[in-house]
């Protein structure tokens, strides 16, 4: 099964080797037929402490690194 890749924005980089990434997605509500925007936060591993708040990054699914981290930052802008 291929690993999932998500794009989002770094909203916190205060922890050592960890960033919090906010991923937004849009979908059409099945009953009301309105587009709804939903966001979710992921803790991602940043081994070089390279990314700061506001950076756009891609994260990839991986094995569990800690209790909450199962994503790794692969590249950013």
UniProtKB/Swiss-Prot annotation:
Domain of life: Bacteria
GO biological process annotation, one example: translation
Keyword terms, alphabetized: Ribonucleoprotein, Ribosomal protein, RNA-binding, rRNA-binding
SUPFAM superfamilies: Nucleic acid-binding proteins
GO MF term set: rRNA binding; structural constituent of ribosome
Pfam annotation, one family: Ribosomal_S17
A single cellular component GO annotation: cytosolic small ribosomal subunit
Physiological role: One of the primary rRNA binding proteins, it binds specifically to the 5'-end of 16S ribosomal RNA.
Subunit structure: Part of the 30S ribosomal subunit.
Family listed: Belongs to the universal ribosomal protein uS17 family.
Record's protein name: Small ribosomal subunit protein uS17
